[in-house]
Design a protein with these regions (language model features):
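Beta-loop-alpha module in the N-terminal Rossmann-like domain of NAD(P)-dependent dehydrogenases
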Residues: 48-66, 77-82
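Aromatic/hydrophobic pocket-lining residues that form π-stacking "cages" and hydrophobic walls in ligand
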Residues: 17, 60, 84-86, 115, ...
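Rossmann-fold NAD(P)-binding glycine/threonine-rich loop
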Residues: 62, 75-96, 106, 111-115
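C-terminal substrate-binding/catalytic lobe of Rossmann-fold NAD(P)-dependent oxidoreductases
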Residues: 3, 7, 12-45, 122-242
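Structural motif
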Residues: 7, 51-52, 74-75, 98, ...
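Short, acidic/turn-prone active-site loops that include or flank metal/cofactor-
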Residues: 34-36, 76-79, 100-101
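Short acidic active-site motifs
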Residues: 36-40, 56, 81-85
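Rossmann-fold dehydrogenase core element
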Residues: 70, 85-102, 120-125
Length: 242
């Protein structure tokens, strides 16, 4: 039985994951938050799941690395330097980092990449996301994940074509860019729309998160899949065999 430890266990996602572990056939190895011993949890668990804060991820990754324990990182708002640290850690342990653990969003990312590859550059790509009023980062990790999928479909990088906001006299839209719009309000769990717009027609690919359990189920599935895997950086698509 896979023992799963949770960093950020007192948060919304941490609690939801803890409630599902035994239902999904795992064992809850315990949780750790800001004042708790991250090293001890890394030793006790077969695999770790991190849904804490971006500022805490470095310490949690170091604990996982020291204990040689695989880790699923679902925390969003990570910096480029943190992604480089994840790459370095993945040379020694199995790491799965994702902006969204929903199985539906994972499939959406594949559809977005395929659409971007098939449609010409005269199709503009815009990504719109909405979350609850308490979310602290924007665009969401999921929106960026979808943007990366679209950019990959066009054989480029998101950093080369990303436009985060428009205000005032911005001029005409530059061809090939990928735009983002972020909305915050109420208790929205997470809505994402990827819009492909051309002259005279528009395609919209949408995902609506209606229950936080979809992310918790995906996180537990990912953790149980990752346990025992060789060192490397994995993605949610690997969990689904996509």
């Amino acid at each position: 039985m896979t023992a799963i430890g949770i960093y950020g266990s007192a948060g919304r996602m941490g609690r939801a994951i803890a409630d599902l572990i035994e239902i999904e056939g795992g064992r809850y190895a315990g949780g750790a938050d800001a004042s708790d011993d991250a090293d001890a949890l890394a030793v006790a668990a077969d695999v770790l799941v991190d849904f804490s804060t971006a500022s805490a991820v470095d310490a949690h990754l170091a604990s996982a690395l020291a204990a040689r324990t695989p880790i699923v990182i679902g925390t969003t708002g990570l910096s480029p330097a943190q992604h480089l640290a994840i790459d370095a850690a993945a040379a020694h342990i199995a790491v799965l980092q994702t902006g969204n653990t929903s199985l539906g969003v994972t499939l959406l990312g594949i559809l977005v990449r395929e659409a971007a590859a098939r449609l010409g550059s005269d199709w503009d790509i815009e990504i719109m996301e909405m979350h609850h009023r308490h979310k602290v980062d924007a665009p969401s990790g999921t929106a960026l994940l979808l943007g990366e999928a679209a950019a990959a479909g066009r054989d480029t990088t998101l950093s080369a074509v990303r436009v985060d906001s428009r205000a005032g006299l911005t001029g005409a839209r530059a061809e090939g860019t990928i735009g983002f719009a972020s909305l915050r309000g109420g208790s929205v769990i997470g809505d994402h729309s990827v819009i492909f717009a051309s002259e005279g027609e528009r395609i919209e690919l949408n995902h609506l998160g209606q229950d936080r359990s979809i992310f918790a189920k995906g996180a537990v599935k990912a953790a149980m899949w990752l346990a025992g895997k060789p060192a490397g950086r994995y993605r949610m698509g690997d969990v689904l065999g996509l």
